[in-house]
Structure formats: structure tokens, C-alpha cells
Swiss-Prot record:
<feature type="binding site">
    <location>
        <position position="10"/>
    </location>
    <ligand>
        <name>Mg(2+)</name>
    </ligand>
</feature>
<feature type="binding site">
    <location>
        <position position="9"/>
    </location>
    <ligand>
        <name>phosphate</name>
    </ligand>
</feature>
<feature type="binding site">
    <location>
        <position position="231"/>
    </location>
    <ligand>
        <name>phosphate</name>
    </ligand>
</feature>
<dbReference type="InterPro" id="IPR023214">
    <property type="entry name" value="HAD_sf"/>
</dbReference>
<keyword id="KW-0378">Hydrolase</keyword>
<feature type="binding site">
    <location>
        <begin position="44"/>
        <end position="45"/>
    </location>
    <ligand>
        <name>phosphate</name>
    </ligand>
</feature>
<dbReference type="InterPro" id="IPR036412">
    <property type="entry name" value="HAD-like_sf"/>
</dbReference>
<dbReference type="GO" id="GO:0016791">
    <property type="term" value="F:phosphatase activity"/>
</dbReference>
<dbReference type="GO" id="GO:0005829">
    <property type="term" value="C:cytosol"/>
</dbReference>
<keyword id="KW-0460">Magnesium</keyword>
<protein>
    <recommendedName>
        <fullName>Putative phosphatase MPN_264</fullName>
        <ecNumber>3.1.3.-</ecNumber>
    </recommendedName>
</protein>
<dbReference type="Pfam" id="PF08282">
    <property type="entry name" value="Hydrolase_3"/>
</dbReference>
<feature type="binding site">
    <location>
        <position position="8"/>
    </location>
    <ligand>
        <name>Mg(2+)</name>
    </ligand>
</feature>
<comment type="similarity">
    <text>Belongs to the HAD-like hydrolase superfamily. Cof family.</text>
</comment>
<feature type="binding site">
    <location>
        <position position="228"/>
    </location>
    <ligand>
        <name>Mg(2+)</name>
    </ligand>
</feature>
<dbReference type="GO" id="GO:0000287">
    <property type="term" value="F:magnesium ion binding"/>
</dbReference>
<dbReference type="InterPro" id="IPR000150">
    <property type="entry name" value="Cof"/>
</dbReference>
Amino acid sequence: MIDLLGLDLDGTLLSRTRQINDPTKQALANLIQKKPSLKVMILTGRSLFSTLKYVQELNELCKKPLVEYFCCYGGAKLYQLNNNQPQEQYKFLIDSRQVKTVFEIVEQHKGLFLAYLDKPKAPYIILGANQFYAWLIKQFWYKQRCEYFKNDHLTDGILKINVYFACPLRLKKVYQIIKRQFQDTLNVVNFSKHLIEITHKDGNKGYAIEAIAKKQGLSLKRMAVIGDSLNDRSMFEKVQYSFAMSKSPDELKLLATEIGTKTNRFRFSSLVDLITEKIIN
């Protein structure tokens, strides 16, 4: 009943230690054994650089090109893997004027502005607005992968913006401001009580999975997805079968055809087992 399985990474495929754990490997192996022709697509908010290693790990695990297509930056960029090299299929950049306006709003409210540049090598992340947070992130997290925001970065193109606030109330206020101002041109997702994720209006996971359906001649009614956060909503709305992780927001659970019940190391593998047992044929 399904030809393609779309998977989110963080909070879904990956364990809390950001690994593909043994129960997950076994569940995926059982799934592929039952339907060898099944394709898997990765859909994540991560950058190309931190996504590619998991794509390659899945393909090595199955000893075949299980994952041919994957999208990064919340759906703003789609890739096809060809001879183990990612080839860009499309991208959606945020208008530079919108980037600057969002930066100014975040700076005014003393939040952290983090944006992903459309660049093939480091530094591909820019930080700004709250100078202390930016310094902290650069020193202890992204290091050489990032640099501080300059107007020159606007010409490189921005794929995705993350906005962070320590105070949930302040984040909620800024979310409402940005959402109201750009509701027709940007995807503005309240990812968590500390994070807002922003992409071009068409730069979302739903658009990506629909694009693959058209490109591969697949039916959305024969696709399933697994996710755990509100940036997965767009792909839940497109496909026939959607599986929400047990700790997903209620808004996502309402869209799901099935909801996970486990919160331990089997939280993802139990959903894959369910697909294997019930809907894979």
C-alpha cells in the first residue's frame, strides 16, 4: 500500500543521542525485507552537511540506494543523491528584504538570529541580533561553521532562519509579529517554546514530498510519513498515511492516522513495525 516512506530526523529517526539506534536499524531492515522496492525520503530542518551522513548511513545499512532524494533546511532545498554526491533539484531563498526585516525584529526584542546561507562550504551559518547568545553559540557550538551577520551575507542567499529566545513569552510575541507581517510570503513555524523556524512560503516538507511524487510518478495515496513537530505538518497534510511520534504537539497528532505510544528507545522502531505489519503491502 505504500511506495515511499518520508522520515524526519531529529526527534523521529534519530535517538536522543542523534544516532540511528539498533532497534531502528532492525525495524528498517524488516521493512525493506518485506518490500524491497520501498524508497525512503529524508525531510529535515538540518543543513546539507549534517544530513548527508545519515543518508549515507541508511544506504550503507541496506546495502543499496534506499534514500535517493532528501530535503534540508525545512524543505527549502531538495537534493538527489547521484553516485553518492548530492545534486540540487530546487531551492527557495528568502527575499533579502524580508531577511533584514526579520533580523531587525529579532534584534529589537533581544533574541538570537541564526540563518543558513546557500553556500557549499563553511561558514554556512550566520549569527546575530543578541550578541551574547551569538558569541556563546559560535564559541561552544558551531565554531568554524558560522560567522557573525553582515549585510554582505544577504547576497549569498538565505535558505532558513531560526529565531531563539530564552523567554517563551517573548518568543510568542515575536512569533505573532513575524507571522502577521509575513503570513502570505513566509512559513513561520512555532517549533518549540524557544524556537521559531522561518522559510520561504514554498520551502516546506509538503512541497518537497509532492514534488517527488510528480517526479517519480508516485501517488500521494501510496506514501507514508513519520514526524514529531509542527514543521512536519505540511507533509502530514499531503500523504495518505501519517505517523506522529508520542511526544508530538497535539496539533500534529490531530492530523495523524496513527500516534506512537512509546517514549523509550523503541519510540521510532515501534511505528516502523506498525507500518510493516499493517500497510506495507
